Amino acid sequence: MSRFVDKLPLFDRRPSPMEEAEGLPRSGYLGQLHHHQYYQPHSNMLPLEQSPPTSTKHTSVTLAQLLKRVNDARSGSSTPISSPRYTIELGGSKPESVSSESDDHHSDDGGSEGQPRALVLKFTDLTYSVKQRRKGSCLPFRRAAADEPELPAMRTLLDGISGEARDGEIMAVLGASGSGKSTLIDALANRIAKESLHGSVTINGESIDSNLLKVISAYVRQEDLLYPMLTVEETLMFAAEFRLPRSLPTREKKKRVKELIDQLGLKRAANTIIGDEGHRGVSGGERRRVSIGVDIIHNPIMLFLDEPTSGLDSTSAFMVVTVLKAIAQSGSVVVMSIHQPSYRILGLLDRLLFLSRGKTVYYGPPSELPPFFLDFGKPIPDNENPTEFALDLIKEMETETEGTKRLAEHNAAWQLKHHGEGRGYGGKPGMSLKEAISASISRGKLVSGATDGTVSVAASDHSAPPPSSSSVSKFVNPFWIEMGVLTRRAFINTKRTPEVFIIRLAAVLVTGFILATIFWRLDESPKGVQERLGFFAIAMSTMYYTCSDALPVFLSERYIFLRETAYNAYRRSSYVLSHTIVGFPSLVVLSFAFALTTFFSVGLAGGVNGFFYFVAIVLASFWAGSGFATFLSGVVTHVMLGFPVVLSTLAYFLLFSGFFINRDRIPRYWLWFHYISLVKYPYEAVMQNEFGDPTRCFVRGVQMFDNTPLAALPAAVKVRVLQSMSASLGVNIGTGTCITTGPDFLKQQAITDFGKWECLWITVAWGFLFRILFYISLLLGSRNKRR
């Protein structure tokens, strides 16, 4: 099998265009993990260049310490730095002599075969099946056609998968699409419900509590779920606020962020926003590394990644895996799925697990791929990437009836022949889980969530009790700190997208201007009364329709929210309240803008008190409308589903508000909808604010004939009709006599069951209710585990 060597010097070399574009360090810990590896057919070691150790003493070091030593060497000495050999272990054996601090680390953790390991993640006979429905059928009772094959009721995604991953190594899960790669990563990361997953997953031979696993591990999704308007440094700093212990000073958190930025090669992009389709930001490779950084901010002991190189070019993909290799060598267990690794990436992987239709078809180091397939009768050509050959062969075998089964049986026989029944590769755990976690903390691992406050950046107190499920709090921060951090982050996002608020304000002002010019200075005639009814109905429904733009807000953040709450970054209640706090000031501005545009122009009554009540009911309408849209955003999963639901529901609310049909004319079987109509209460509130004064008269004398057939009669005839009515009724009715006052008109409209202040508070209560329902929807609908 052919290999190649990158001959570029490690120091004082010119940066490549990709490095200049993505800000990768030219020297330091990551700069020394070079682009090409020399992969020898009869050796399990990868020689790499590295800066010299400052001491020959065997000590475990963290990434931060290595970075500090390199920086100190560069800044504090003018002597040229030599480049001794640095070795990354690929197989189970170790060379006789190595001179690097990584060797010290491996030596401490049991890197050589037979020596104890600090952490061993072992999974045994993992099996997971899901119910399967016939394609194209929405009805479960649909009968199959005669020529249609009967599908099995259950589909097995994982079928007896076993293996182990160790600290200091990267285990890569490979396979074609649908082979079960992501499912296995989810199973190991405890993202599948226990009642659905069969088999066992242990760390150092012990089952682990779910809360403790969330504290010591991280899960990186395939998608880059980041706020586009935050800079790289801000994104990582907010992650530090959520994941690092509250006892850790802010300066230490900032220090950790700076170190992580250097570690990820993001120094040049630190002050660049993430960006999206409408805003230029970091490159795809940098965005991927930021996504990884968000989840490793607390320096997790276990790291699970679902295809971290997906969608990246070869150079960016290699740098991402290089970062993961550095994380593994700092003492973490790294498990990731990957579609098709290149030669260079293969040189960084320690253990491979190939899946085909949920079965294990190869498990072992990359160096054993050639003899494995040679023994199977399919030798790997010398000039071909072993993983590409393996994936192509596996895909070909899947087309055969018993192809996958044959390959899986060959793997089982190979494992039994070369590694025995235990399927182990090298060392076993030399300490208990608690001891291993304590040892990891003492090496500088940042384990978030310890209630005793003993965890810090450079925790070195070996006497401190190890964290356990009982000593680990569910959340790092108390409620009020979560509120502050979430509110601050949301305000930054809002401030950097002013166009969103400007468009909303423009919509309100344009609507108010149109209404003001149409209903300009309404009089107190019967026609003016009818025109007021139309103005109030349109105005109050407009408040709700303009709130529909709140629907995409949470939908755009949904997956970020799911990622952050999967590891208890914050409480759902904190998110709901901070979301409310950030959105409320804009509602106040919109309310005053609409009221100032319409109240005096239309000629509404009430003076100053009436104006401020009008502002209050408009604000309450915005509050209830935004709450309704927010609640729906927690229920629906896509904006294309949400908008039809919002618009149609608001149309029903307007229909049953009492404007088109009075309450006493609504059929009894629809009366319940009248009382849950969001438009009913603000509509009745402004009606009472306008017509509640008994001293105001809206129909006088002959005006009673308006909107009747008698309206066409001459004025003199109308007066004689009034005189005849007066004589008949015994009541003096003249042309100036008040026939209908404001309260009389409210009775005609059946607006009698609630006062105007009651309508105001009911509208406010709707807003609170919908936000409570939004919180409940987050509790019920944000499960991060498969069923």
Swiss-Prot record:
Listed under GO biological process in this entry are: cellular response to hypoxia; cellular response to osmotic stress; cellular response to salt stress; positive regulation of response to salt stress; potassium ion homeostasis; regulation of secondary shoot formation; response to abscisic acid; response to auxin
Where in the sequence does UniProt note compositional bias of the Polar residues kind?
Answer: 74-85
Record's protein name: ABC transporter G family member 5
Tell me where in this chain the ABC transporter domain is found.
Answer: 121-382
Compartments in which it is found: Cell membrane
Q: Give the CC-aspect GO terms.
A: Casparian strip; membrane; plasma membrane; suberin network
Membrane spanning stretches? 500-520, 535-555, 576-596, 599-619, 620-640, 641-661, 728-745, 760-780
The encoding gene: RCN1
Q: What induces it?
A: Strongly up-regulated in roots after exposure to salt and osmotic stresses. Induced in roots by benzylaminopurine (BAP), abscisic acid (ABA) and salicylic acid (SA). Accumulates in shoots upon heat (e.g. 42 degrees Celsius). Repressed in roots by NaCl, jasmonic acid (JA), gibberellic acid (GA) and auxin (IAA). Accumulates in most hypodermal and some endodermal roots cells under stagnant deoxygenated conditions leading to hypoxia.
Q: What is its main location?
A: membrane
Listed Basic and acidic residues bias regions: 1-17
Recorded source organism is Oryza sativa subsp. japonica
